[in-house]
Amino acid sequence: MRFPFSLNLSLSSYLFKQRVSGKEKFPLVLMLEPLHACNLECAGCGRIKEYESTINDTMPLEIALKAVDDCGAPVVSVTGGEPLLYQPIGELIEELVRRKKHIYLCTNGVLLERSLKKFRPNKFLHINVSLDGMAETHDKISGEKGVFDKAISGIKKARAAGFRVCTNTSIYKETDLKEIETLFHFLKNININGILAAPAFEYDVLSKKIFLDRQATHRQFEFISSISKKLPIMSTPLYLKFLKGKRHLECTPWGNPTYNSQGWKSPCYLITDTHYKTFKELMTKTDWAKYGTGKDPRCANCMMHSGFEPTVVREVGKNFSDFWEMIVWNFT
């Protein structure tokens, strides 16, 4: 299975409860950013620049857990910054496991090997390592030599210890797709559990020269989709069709709400117009109708999984052929 049975069961149960209750807008994945400090300055990441004035702020553990409880999403993505720099990261993960949340611990992998002792393998924890190319390319994007080798060493140690590990690859304008194919087969050969791939987001604070426009995304993902059946790709087939320009999907910005030291980030993980103090305020005060392709120019080229995979989850039960395609894909 592409995803563990326990995760499929949790999501199905959660979706059923939301639909029975009549809720139209509800979160699927909480993006929890306990800090924005990082040990790298990656070329495609706008987080450090966006939160430069508060880069040293760290979220107290009890505040992080309150956000998890207030949101109620069945999945929590612990990100940043580099979450392995967060001092109580072991306690945070343990508390999330105790709450039976499915966790994606997102890391650049530099500190992974030495941090494994803080965690224990279990069905709720997935370690998600960013890898944007083979060694030379990935080190260049990361701004430091040796990053790729450290990440791979950490991945191998984590898999040997029994942890579930997946990777996340951002695709840029200059990405060499044959190199990405080589990377994905390399990851499969070291027994990775899954691979995510998505076009990098065009942050306002970064140079737009490195990012894909919509047409370029279609071309790049035609190739990635063509190799996906041979690999443990976790991007859903409906999302891949969207990336190829073969399927229309509307963004679901509330599907992956973000909480950090400034509060609840509105409207989405990628765009910041304001921060709200409470989750309820985020959901009720954000004018969701203002955002999306053709509505806000910042959304023009965005095809990120954080906005569109939640749409797939919301839509899949409405069409039998989509539902069956997802079932077959998940079991292959």
Residue ranges, per PLM feature:
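Conserved alpha-helical substructure of the radical SAM core
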Residues: 2-118, 122-123, 315, 325, ...
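Generic structural signal for helix capping and beta-alpha/helix-loop junctions
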Residues: 52, 113, 136, 175, ...
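Radical SAM enzyme [4Fe-4S]-AdoMet core and its adjacent flexible, acidic
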Residues: 59, 125, 130-132, 140-256, ...
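Accessory C-terminal segments flanking Radical SAM cores
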Residues: 232-332
